């Protein structure tokens, strides 16, 4: 498998420090499976973009029954010392779409059994504790759901993290209107 890591550094002042970007991938047990480093091309003020490619032999693929997640650790180093960075969970998988066969996850053709999920939790409102999301997603998975459509807007990051961890596919939605705002009264749809 190949992971493309796109990194961006914004320097507010010029520096003569030796700046490096590092991307390291760890398996679920914490063992390092891939790493790449590159020197930031210049120390000038402004934005620098770098691309790193990590190669993984025999990857453990994420799937619905075994939602295996790696940890990608990205760092900015100045003279060898970490000055910024983050960790991101990463699932490795392949997707195929065919007009006759449908959808395949990791070369396994399957039915997508999805539901629409809105951002609120009924009487709890729109600020939903993670435990409530986890319970709801587990209940959906127990009744055979394998995919969630995020209706009608991007959800809280915790929902995506839980879907990754629990083995649920996601169809994300940017908005429920593409070109014009809702004007249902124009054709009498509001009656």
Question: For each predicted feature, which ranges?
Answer:
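Secreted/periplasmic carbohydrate-active enzymes, especially glycoside hydrolases
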Residues: 1-162, 166-170
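Short, glycine/acidic-enriched loop or turn micro-motifs at the edges of active sites
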Residues: 176
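Generic structural signal for helix capping and beta-alpha/helix-loop junctions
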Residues: 157, 179-180
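Active-site neighborhood of glycoside hydrolase catalytic domains
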Residues: 165, 182-191
């Amino acid at each position: 498998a190949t992971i493309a890591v796109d990194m961006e550094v914004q320097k507010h002042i010029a520096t003569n420090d030796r700046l490096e970007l590092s991307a390291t991938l760890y398996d679920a047990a914490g063992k390092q499976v891939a790493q790449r480093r590159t020197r930031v091309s210049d120390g000038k003020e402004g934005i620098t973009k770098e691309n790193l490619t990590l190669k993984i032999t025999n990857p453990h693929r994420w799937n619905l029954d075994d939602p295996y997640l790696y940890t990608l650790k990205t760092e900015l180093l100045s003279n060898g010392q970490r000055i910024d960075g983050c960790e991101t969970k990463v699932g490795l998988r392949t997707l195929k779409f065919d007009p006759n066969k449908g959808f395949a996850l990791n070369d396994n053709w399957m039915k997508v059994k999805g539901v629409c999920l809105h951002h609120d939790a009924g009487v709890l409102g729109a600020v939903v504790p993670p435990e409530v999301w986890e319970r709801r997603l587990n209940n959906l998975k127990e009744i055979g759901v394998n995919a969630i459509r995020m209706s009608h807007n991007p959800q809280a990051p915790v929902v995506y993290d839980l879907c990754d961890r629990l083995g649920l596919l996601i169809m994300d939605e940017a908005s429920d209107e593409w070109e014009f705002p809702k004007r249902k009264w124009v054709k009498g749809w509001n009656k």
